[in-house]
Amino acid sequence: MLSLQQYNKQLPEIAKLVSRWDKASRVQLIKEISDHILVVNMRQKQFLTIELQINYDKVYQVPSIRFRLWEHALDDEDVSSSKLLFLSDVELRSIIALNSFSVSLSSDPTTKEVWYHVNNCDTDANVGTEPERYLLRWISLYLQIFDPTLNIMLI
């Protein structure tokens, strides 16, 4: 477990690291009153963007990832459009490296937006409980879902 105070303290450093990630096209740290959110847009393929949010799960007291997939298109008149994609598990696994991670779809109770959520039940077992550098250990594992070479960037 990671306290909310430690999460908020460590997240700005993580935002700096993630901004160096070659797949990240946009990185924004949103400082809310109680907790902070890191928003990352990343190009996965030419016409596919992943909108990723790292936030704090107050129930489990660990960081959490939610994401959405956006497909981009150009029509005959070069007008661009984007649509939200909802894929089967097999299709999703062909785009991102879920490996042993489980993902579910659910809606945000406040905004009613639908997101994929990475299951965070085993977070402490995966990254340990020592608060120092907790988020660094966490992103080096959990962001590999989106880029298996990410841990090299963090060394």
From Swiss-Prot:
EC number(s) on record?
A: 2.3.2.-
Q: Where in the cell is it found?
A: Preautophagosomal structure membrane
Q: How does it sit in the membrane?
A: Peripheral membrane protein
| Top-level taxon | Eukaryota
Catalytic residues, chain numbering: 121
CC per GO annotation: phagophore assembly site membrane
Give the main location: membrane
Q: Which molecular function GO terms apply here?
A: Atg12 transferase activity
Task: Alphabetically list the UniProt keywords.
Answer: Autophagy, Membrane, Protein transport, Transferase, Transport, Ubl conjugation pathway
What family name appears in the similarity comment?
A: Belongs to the ATG10 family.
Name used for this protein in its record: Ubiquitin-like-conjugating enzyme ATG10
Look up and give the organism this protein is from: Kluyveromyces lactis (strain ATCC 8585 / CBS 2359 / DSM 70799 / NBRC 1267 / NRRL Y-1140 / WM37)
